[in-house]
Amino acid sequence: MMVDVLIKDISQMVTMKGSNGPRRGKDMREVHLIEDGWIAIKGDKIVAVGSGLMEENLKIGKNTMVIDGKGKTVTPGLVDPHTHLVHGGSRENELALKLNGVPYLDILAQGGGILSTVKATRKATVEELMQQGKRSLDQMLSFGVTTVEVKSGYGLNTETELKQLEVIRQLNKEHPCDLVPTFMGAHAIPMEYKEDPDVFVDIVIDEMLPAVVERGLAEFCDVFCEKGVFTVAQSRRVLEAAREAGLKLRIHVDEIEALGGAELAAEMGAITAEHLMVTSEEDMKKMAKAGVIAALLPGTSFNLMVGKYAQARKMIDYGVPITLSTDYNPGSCPTENIQFIMTLGCLAMKMTPEEVFTAVTINGAAAVDRQGDIGSLEVGKKADVVIFNAPNINYIPYHFGINHVDKVLKNGKLVVDKGRVI
């Protein structure tokens, strides 16, 4: 077989070989490293992975791209399973408020936070949203991310929610990264319904959701279950309607106060529960039993300066599968740098480098229901591959604040070279 791409003499390769995940407990440390390895690609698929001498049936031709992996670490394409990528405006004006100790929910109650981004997103044109989205996706790709979950939720009316989701669909067509769309009309209560949130929930269920489903614009539905946002009862209503309409479920819970959202995620069979900064051990056990993946967002804790992080170690001990994400958004976590999030996973949440890589590869893939296609370097999976300028996996979270990516292949095509999108 003539191969299109051969990466050879790889110092360390993280294959993530094994079950399609999600991995949990001690299995999160089993990344199945190969040293002095190689990987062969034909078209958009991985056709062989090994160490030492290449298999005899694989042929290199004059058109084969041969990449030297000496001194490099090679991993599956990274997955960022929780982002708010498409938005208008920015919120640097809130930095001074945060530094003066104004709580996040107080900023939201004053019409800031999510609501200020809603205002900007409603005003933004499709072209403006496309340009902003492409910039952020280029940044993510340069850091090694090849698959991104993207939520709506900065419209809070049918017209703008559809506009956001249409932009997400178009970005998915035009950008190398694969985008997984999530409808999040229940992201906040807009000012016009502040005194009657149940009416807004009716609009999400009866008007927004059918319009989204009719157009095939979303794969998932998400809700922000939090004090001052949506109650457990309201969240359940939205999720039940979304499930009945054929969408898969995810839910923002326990970011600031534990209302019972993690238990709701387990009850509803959500694929992910996200944030989980104040989740009880009892609810961790319920999530583990139900197989809910914990999408942890340490960058948000870092940026909000709350002094606490999700209890990743306890979750791992209880058997909750964990993924990590940037939570990229213009307010509580304005970063596209997944590598910094990996460092926080180690330093702030005491995860091992092996657990961190599991979290951003195969478990990230499971969090967006793509584990059969991506998340590991195995024969038959998509050729989404990252080549890091690092001698081993420990070096990447250890040496933080820079971009370690040398090259990225997406579907077998070189899309990043020398750390730059091409």
Swiss-Prot record:
<dbReference type="InterPro" id="IPR032466">
    <property type="entry name" value="Metal_Hydrolase"/>
</dbReference>
<dbReference type="Pfam" id="PF01979">
    <property type="entry name" value="Amidohydro_1"/>
</dbReference>
<feature type="binding site">
    <location>
        <position position="82"/>
    </location>
    <ligand>
        <name>Zn(2+)</name>
    </ligand>
</feature>
<feature type="binding site">
    <location>
        <position position="327"/>
    </location>
    <ligand>
        <name>Fe(3+)</name>
    </ligand>
</feature>
<feature type="binding site">
    <location>
        <position position="84"/>
    </location>
    <ligand>
        <name>Zn(2+)</name>
    </ligand>
</feature>
<feature type="binding site">
    <location>
        <position position="252"/>
    </location>
    <ligand>
        <name>Fe(3+)</name>
    </ligand>
</feature>
<feature type="binding site">
    <location>
        <position position="332"/>
    </location>
    <ligand>
        <name>4-imidazolone-5-propanoate</name>
    </ligand>
</feature>
<dbReference type="GO" id="GO:0019557">
    <property type="term" value="P:L-histidine catabolic process to glutamate and formate"/>
</dbReference>
<feature type="binding site">
    <location>
        <position position="82"/>
    </location>
    <ligand>
        <name>Fe(3+)</name>
    </ligand>
</feature>
<dbReference type="InterPro" id="IPR005920">
    <property type="entry name" value="HutI"/>
</dbReference>
<feature type="binding site">
    <location>
        <position position="329"/>
    </location>
    <ligand>
        <name>N-formimidoyl-L-glutamate</name>
    </ligand>
</feature>
<dbReference type="InterPro" id="IPR011059">
    <property type="entry name" value="Metal-dep_hydrolase_composite"/>
</dbReference>
<dbReference type="InterPro" id="IPR006680">
    <property type="entry name" value="Amidohydro-rel"/>
</dbReference>
<feature type="binding site">
    <location>
        <position position="91"/>
    </location>
    <ligand>
        <name>4-imidazolone-5-propanoate</name>
    </ligand>
</feature>
<comment type="similarity">
    <text>Belongs to the metallo-dependent hydrolases superfamily. HutI family.</text>
</comment>
<keyword id="KW-0479">Metal-binding</keyword>
<feature type="binding site">
    <location>
        <position position="187"/>
    </location>
    <ligand>
        <name>4-imidazolone-5-propanoate</name>
    </ligand>
</feature>
<comment type="function">
    <text>Catalyzes the hydrolytic cleavage of the carbon-nitrogen bond in imidazolone-5-propanoate to yield N-formimidoyl-L-glutamate. It is the third step in the universal histidine degradation pathway.</text>
</comment>
<keyword id="KW-0963">Cytoplasm</keyword>
<keyword id="KW-0369">Histidine metabolism</keyword>
<feature type="binding site">
    <location>
        <position position="331"/>
    </location>
    <ligand>
        <name>N-formimidoyl-L-glutamate</name>
    </ligand>
</feature>
<dbReference type="GO" id="GO:0050480">
    <property type="term" value="F:imidazolonepropionase activity"/>
</dbReference>
<dbReference type="GO" id="GO:0005737">
    <property type="term" value="C:cytoplasm"/>
</dbReference>
<comment type="pathway">
    <text>Amino-acid degradation; L-histidine degradation into L-glutamate; N-formimidoyl-L-glutamate from L-histidine: step 3/3.</text>
</comment>
<feature type="binding site">
    <location>
        <position position="327"/>
    </location>
    <ligand>
        <name>Zn(2+)</name>
    </ligand>
</feature>
<dbReference type="GO" id="GO:0019556">
    <property type="term" value="P:L-histidine catabolic process to glutamate and formamide"/>
</dbReference>
<feature type="binding site">
    <location>
        <position position="84"/>
    </location>
    <ligand>
        <name>Fe(3+)</name>
    </ligand>
</feature>
<keyword id="KW-0378">Hydrolase</keyword>
<dbReference type="GO" id="GO:0008270">
    <property type="term" value="F:zinc ion binding"/>
</dbReference>
<feature type="binding site">
    <location>
        <position position="154"/>
    </location>
    <ligand>
        <name>4-imidazolone-5-propanoate</name>
    </ligand>
</feature>
<feature type="binding site">
    <location>
        <position position="154"/>
    </location>
    <ligand>
        <name>N-formimidoyl-L-glutamate</name>
    </ligand>
</feature>
<keyword id="KW-0408">Iron</keyword>
<keyword id="KW-0862">Zinc</keyword>
<dbReference type="GO" id="GO:0005506">
    <property type="term" value="F:iron ion binding"/>
</dbReference>
<protein>
    <recommendedName>
        <fullName>Imidazolonepropionase</fullName>
        <ecNumber>3.5.2.7</ecNumber>
    </recommendedName>
</protein>
<feature type="binding site">
    <location>
        <position position="255"/>
    </location>
    <ligand>
        <name>4-imidazolone-5-propanoate</name>
    </ligand>
</feature>
<feature type="binding site">
    <location>
        <position position="252"/>
    </location>
    <ligand>
        <name>Zn(2+)</name>
    </ligand>
</feature>
